[in-house]
Amino acid sequence: MNSFLMTCAMKAAKCLLVDGRLDYSSDEYWYRFGQDYDENKIDVFYCLSTTLLSSNDKDGNPSLFSNLSKEDISIMQDEYKYMSTEMFDSEHFNFIAPYYRQMTFEAYEQTDESAVIHALAPAITDICDAFDYYMENLNNGRPFIIAGFSQGGIMTQSLLVHMSDKQYKQVIAAYSIGYELTEDILKKDHIKAAEGEDDLGVIISYNSVASTDTMWDLIEGNCAVCINPLNWKTDDTPATLRYDGDEASVHVDKEKQVLIVEGLDPEKYDGLGYPIEKGIYHMWDPRFYVKEIKANAIHRAELFKNSINKV
């Protein structure tokens, strides 16, 4: 099965914008690009999650994608700052992150496929253009990681399909955090699900919930695979999560392919201000496993380096 959003994303990728493309040679379209760049560190190309509400167009209708106003860019800062300090810190990583005309929250309420494709086309166009600019002007043939959370997970999967076979050979791993990996997308080029902590060129995908009764069908209703970042198992072997003084047991539900987090208070771990049903730990998917993702990214990068040295 495929998800509605990913179906729209793949169709949007076939109708990238011709006019109105952004100039990624300009610093204004980057949170960070090449500042303090160190070839001894690991490149991470990061795609932001949904952070914005729609603004109205000139006719008073909600625009379903960002226009990258100063206000939009200001709102985007918090996630970039968190991810570039806590998960992909400057000690180990070169954090490369574009601003892009992301789909807004209101777009998720749309049931008309054409409207969602229209909303996703600028986002995917921008992410692909930003990635191409990075590859042509900074990467210099080096291995890299791509990562994204939520809508950024859609962008991560779209980038894997977009890139050339030569570029894919440089991929250490892809972290599609908080977005489903479906059976249909697994059939696409360059999409290979992680099976453990050591495999390379793979995509890591997981979604956390209190139970299968509290699932967000839009982003985790069609999961074909799931990996537990606490123990890097794809079976239902449990692992202990320790976060903010709390402790929980986390295992993969083999039927729904989501992470079941048992032992946390859903009232405490809510949607962080977003209208998300209690027991859906979507907003916590980066935070719960931040140390494990960081350590794993470093580990896989070292394995990739060793594999090159053996050739």
Where are these regions (language model features)?
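Flexible, membrane-associating and regulatory peripheral segments of lipid-active enzymes
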Residues: M1-M87
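Loop/turn elements at helix/coil->beta-strand transitions in domains of secreted/extracellular proteins
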Residues: N40-I42, E91-F95, N140-P143, K169-A173
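Conserved beta-strand scaffold positions in the cores of enzyme catalytic domains, especially
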Residues: V44, F95-A97, I203-S205
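A general structural signal for short secondary-structure junctions and capping/turn motifs
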Residues: G34-D38, S84-D89, K166, E195-E197, ...
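Surface cap/lid and interfacial helix-loop subdomains adjacent to catalytic sites
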Residues: D126-N140, V161-V311
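Active-site catalytic motif of lipid deacylating hydrolases and related acyltransferases
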Residues: L48-R142, Y269-V311
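Gly/Ala-rich beta-loop-alpha elbow adjacent to hydrolase catalytic centers
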Residues: G148-G152, T156
